């Protein structure tokens, strides 16, 4: 089971930097910069890949169907675009309930993966203050199937704005 999605950073900047240093400085000065640039280019970078979140939600949906869990979860079914970060945080909190109710290791790992990916994507929106949004406890309680459908809908909102 995958936990993070590593991506390589663009190496073009490092190559241009090395060429610049090679043409203007001594070779000895360029070698450490070149080595560090190569290391930096190969380091994994975690980015929210919202398509992977949707795939993981589908995995949970398939497993849930075979387990027959009757939990109801706070679900935002009509997310306003100005409240999508708040709604996403509520969905992520409710995912823990699915993990606890199912007592299934695959679901637990998939939930953890979704949380890591989504929080990575939300990191640029952490300081955004959304006003007029419902608190998690004010949302309507719905079954897991409807919860997952609404979750996919909000993830698609993030895909459409990225």
From Swiss-Prot:
It is found in: Secreted. GO terms for molecular function: cytokine activity; cytokine receptor binding. Transmembrane segments: none annotated. One of its GO terms (biological process) is positive regulation of cytokine production. InterPro entries: 4_helix_cytokine-like_core, IL-15, IL-15/IL-21_fam, IL-15_mml. Disulfide bonds join 83-133, 90-136. Glycans are attached at residues 104, 127. Residues 30-48 form a propeptide. This is Interleukin-15. It comes from Felis catus (Cat). The gene is IL15.
